[in-house]
């Protein structure tokens, strides 16, 4: 089994903020598959089981995401872990896959690294960098950013669908990594 985690913050206050990119992408994937999440008090997370994947949205707030991830990882005895998260070091429209590495100051990744190690797969979704990091990651996308954000999130969702079908991280990485922002037509 593979644990596929979308990072974000719970509550309506944070809906569709930059920091909730992981939640939004998993929500879109689950909706397209005509599935739904159920809340698991045991893992303090929303869960969805599809094929041999556990899709997880921790409800602990970002800084404690590792608690939900570790709980589900141990309970389901998953062999692989893929984290979908926002990355302010990448421009909006860039989507990158990688295995392992540092947390780049991302508090959700820090929490997961501390409890689970840092040798997991990552789907990094660019949100660009703002002047005030905290305000920026907790802000919603501007209207003029929406088309590019939507295209990048759609690309990320399609990458996850490919990964679920192929079970091949390297093929997914090679096929779906975008080193430059997507080009969208106006």
Swiss-Prot record:
Annotated active site: 19
One GO biological process term: protein quality control for misfolded or incompletely synthesized proteins
Q: What is its EC number?
A: 3.1.1.29
Taxonomy, superkingdom: Bacteria
Q: Where is this site: Stabilizes the basic form of H active site to accept a proton?
A: 86
Q: What role does it play?
A: Hydrolyzes ribosome-free peptidyl-tRNAs (with 1 or more amino acids incorporated), which drop off the ribosome during protein synthesis, or as a result of ribosome stalling. Catalyzes the release of premature peptidyl moieties from peptidyl-tRNA molecules trapped in stalled 50S ribosomal subunits, and thus maintains levels of free tRNAs and 50S ribosomes.
Query: How does the record describe its quaternary structure?
Result: Monomer.
Say if the entry is tagged with keyword Transmembrane helix: no
Q: Which GO terms describe its cellular component?
A: cytoplasm
Q: Which GO terms describe its molecular function?
A: peptidyl-tRNA hydrolase activity; tRNA binding
Keyword Zinc attached = no
Q: Where in the cell is it found?
A: Cytoplasm
Reactions the enzyme catalyzes: an N-acyl-L-alpha-aminoacyl-tRNA + H2O = an N-acyl-L-amino acid + a tRNA + H(+)
Similarity field: Belongs to the PTH family.
- Could you say which residues bind tRNA here? 14, 61, 63, 107
Provide the protein name: Peptidyl-tRNA hydrolase
Indicate the annotated site residue(s) for Discriminates between blocked and unblocked aminoacyl-tRNA. 9
Q: What keywords were assigned to this record?
A: Cytoplasm, Hydrolase, RNA-binding, tRNA-binding
């Amino acid at each position: 089994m593979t644990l596929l985690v979308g990072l974000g913050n719970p509550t309506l206050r944070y809906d569709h903020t930059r920091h909730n990119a992981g939640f939004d992408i998993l929500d879109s994937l689950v909706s397209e598959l005509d599935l739904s999440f159920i809340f698991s008090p045991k893992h303090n997370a929303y869960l969805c089981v599809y094929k041999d994947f556990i899709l997880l949205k921790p409800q602990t707030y970002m800084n404690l995401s590792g608690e939900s991830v570790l709980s589900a990882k141990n309970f389901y005895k998953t062999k692989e872990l893929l984290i979908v998260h926002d990355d302010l070091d990448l421009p909006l429209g860039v989507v990158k896959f990688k295995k392992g590495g540092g947390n780049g100051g991302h508090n959700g990744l820090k929490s997961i690294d501390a409890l689970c190690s840092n040798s997991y797969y990552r789907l990094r979704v660019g949100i660009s960098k703002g002047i005030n990091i905290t305000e920026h990651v907790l802000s919603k996308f501007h209207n003029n950013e929406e088309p590019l954000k939507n295209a990048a999130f759609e690309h990320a969702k399609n990458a996850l669908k490919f990964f679920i079908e192929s079970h091949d991280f390297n093929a997914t990485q090679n096929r779906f990594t975008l080193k430059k922002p997507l080009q969208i037509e106006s």
